[in-house]
From Swiss-Prot:
This is Cobalt-precorrin-8 methylmutase. Pathway: Cofactor biosynthesis; adenosylcobalamin biosynthesis; cob(II)yrinate a,c-diamide from sirohydrochlorin (anaerobic route): step 9/10. It is an enzyme of class 5 (isomerase). GO terms for biological process: cobalamin biosynthetic process. It comes from Methanocaldococcus jannaschii (strain ATCC 43067 / DSM 2661 / JAL-1 / JCM 10045 / NBRC 100440).
Length: 210
């Protein structure tokens, strides 16, 4: 939420003030449950979506922000489910395999979605890396399977797929896995949410404000 000109800075400051007030209205006394960095991420998401309800939908599990900051400082790769998310992330090591030729081949051969196939192809990068999913519940389910069945250990999973088919269920399943994660309750999520979260963590890793 940066700005260059004086007018831009004034707008940014006013916007941040409005966002914070909206968050306070939504959370009430629950606002004390979140630490400073978590509040910074919540502010980013609310700003990106113009939807204060996200303040009560975001779930942080197993110190995900701190783990994400460490992973970014160690220059770990980020694996995403769609190229739109890749385009929005301010980081060099971002990978998306959804359009990889091998993904098309495996998906067709095995009768699975390309999203699932892309996560299987990225398995070695996911292990000790960061996963950011904002669109595909099946991709998130596959990452969870890799964690449970193949002992893959991501540093952080940002799981915020959007939609009314399997999205809520995939995020519930993520919260049951013992890995650092950030997710949303219910069907809401999507690219803007995913990008806002991971860019906030990247900003923290660079010692900037979220």
């Amino acid at each position: 939420m940066g700005a260059i000109s004086k007018d831009g800075l004034n707008i940014a400051n006013k916007s941040r003030e409005i966002v914070r007030n909206k968050i306070k209205e939504v959370l009430g006394d629950r606002i004390n449950e979140f630490n400073e960095k978590e509040m910074g991420i919540i502010e980013r998401v609310v700003h990106a979506t113009a939807d204060p309800e996200y303040a009560k939908l975001l779930v942080f599990k197993n110190n995900p922000i701190e783990e994400g900051i460490k992973a970014i400082k160690e220059e770990k790769p980020i694996i995403v489910d769609v190229n739109m998310i890749k385009a929005g992330i301010r980081y060099n090591k971002v990978h998306c395999f959804i359009n990889h030729p091998d993904v098309y081949e495996v998906a067709k051969k095995e009768g699975i979605t390309r999203a699932v196939a892309s996560m299987r192809l990225a398995k070695d990068l996911i292990d000790d890396g960061i996963v950011v999913i904002g669109n595909s519940p099946t991709a998130l389910f596959e990452v969870i399977r890799l964690v449970k069945e193949e002992n893959i250990k991501p540093k952080l999973i940002v799981g915020v797929p959007v939609g009314f088919v399997q999205a809520s269920e995939s995020k519930e399943a993520l919260r049951e896995v013992n890995v650092p994660s950030i997710s949303t309750i219910g069907p809401k999520g999507g690219t803007p949410v995913a990008v806002a979260i991971i860019n906030g963590i990247i900003a923290y890793a660079k010692n900037e404000k979220a």
